[in-house]
């Protein structure tokens, strides 16, 4: 008689796992998303109290498992990679808000979140450059729906989320009808209680659909705490489209200072905007506007303003700036002093007098 083969329950379980592993995923957005969410839950969400070295290994396994299922054609691979990082971004934010997370796991996930953002932005730029197969459309429909989740203001990472939203609509969701539909949907949500993310999204889609006329009125609904979100449009749009944002900052810089009392955050804000304000004022030949902006932004604008005044030979104003700022002689560059001396030595007298008086008084 034929020998009977004994198979243990454990072997059966392993064989079942192998079969499940090898099942191909249906080539649809929803199947891919479900597979990712399931893998992320098993590897990451269920292990948020584990030591970070263990989480590092599980993160690598998670990424490898997803990549192993991807199609090999270049353009599809780019799309699938983008979708992988997009959902990883969403799922990581959800995990970071979990009550069951250790300090080490939080630190690890925050680092991964930054890397995920960089990868996503890189892939969006790559996807812009390839011709898009028609079959991408159902995937883009899924991305459009899931992007709406990023507009929830209670998400503590909403600055990063709104930038992902803006980048996706700029780089990969270029179909005019899609953009118009999105703008219509956003405008229905606009009211006095609308969240800042809805306002930012509406401004962005207005720019992309050439509806620039409502940008200015929407900007005025922003609170000073949200002004740093404006730098995205100044950095990434052309000079013409950036104009209303630069003007808004020029007009409202004092409001920002009333709100933001932290020295370094004020300095960072001014340092970002000042080169753009200068470029804009040069273009429209209104340097007095730039000077007024610099004066409002003192002391954070000091270095920029000082070099501008020397560059344009406004030596009297340069001396006044140093007198106002009470800066010691050691901190004034000898080249700067020579430049003023060659132009009009008398201008330096009040500066030297002030410094001598300080020495006598102290």
Tell me what each language-model feature is:
Residues 5-362:
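Eukaryote-biased, non-catalytic alpha-solenoid scaffold regions
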Residues 1-2:
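Elongated alpha-helical scaffolds
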């Amino acid at each position: 008689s034929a020998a009977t083969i004994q198979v243990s329950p454990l072997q059966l379980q392993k064989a079942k796992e192998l079969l499940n592993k090898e099942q191909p995923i249906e080539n649809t957005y929803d199947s891919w998303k479900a597979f990712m969410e399931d893998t992320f839950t098993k590897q990451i969400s269920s292990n948020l109290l584990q030591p970070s070295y263990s989480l590092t290994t599980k993160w690598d396994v998670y990424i490898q498992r997803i990549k192993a299922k991807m199609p090999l054609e270049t353009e599809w691979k780019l799309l699938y990679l983008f979708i992988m990082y997009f959902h990883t971004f969403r799922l990581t934010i959800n995990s970071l808000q979990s009550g069951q997370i250790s300090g080490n796991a939080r630190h690890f996930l925050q680092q991964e979140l930054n890397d995920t953002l960089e990868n996503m932005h890189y892939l969006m730029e790559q996807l812009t450059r390839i011709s898009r197969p028609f079959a991408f459309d159902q995937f883009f429909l899924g991305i459009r729906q899931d992007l709406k989740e990023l507009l929830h203001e209670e998400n503590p990472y909403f600055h990063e989320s709104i930038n992902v939203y803006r980048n996706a609509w700029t780089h990969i969701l270029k179909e005019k009808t899609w953009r118009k539909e999105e703008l219509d949907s956003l405008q229905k949500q606009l009211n006095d209680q609308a969240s800042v993310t809805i306002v930012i999204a509406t401004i962005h889609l207005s720019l992309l659909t050439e509806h620039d006329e409502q940008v200015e009125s929407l900007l005025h609904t922003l609170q000073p705490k949200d002004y740093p979100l404006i730098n995205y449009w100044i950095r990434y749009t052309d000079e013409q489209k950036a104009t209303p944002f630069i003007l808004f900052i020029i007009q409202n810089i004092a409001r920002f200072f009333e709100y933001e009392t932290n020295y370094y955050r004020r300095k960072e804000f001014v340092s970002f905007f000042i080169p753009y304000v200068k470029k804009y004022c040069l273009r429209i030949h209104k340097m007095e506007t730039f000077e007024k902006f610099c004066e409002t932004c003192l002391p954070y604008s000091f270095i920029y303003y000082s070099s501008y005044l020397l560059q344009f030979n406004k030596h009297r104003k340069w001396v006044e700036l140093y007198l106002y700022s009470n800066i010691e002689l050691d901190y004034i560059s000898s080249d700067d002093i020579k430049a003023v001396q060659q132009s009009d030595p008398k201008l330096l007298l009040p500066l030297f007098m002030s410094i001598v008086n300080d020495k006598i008084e102290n």
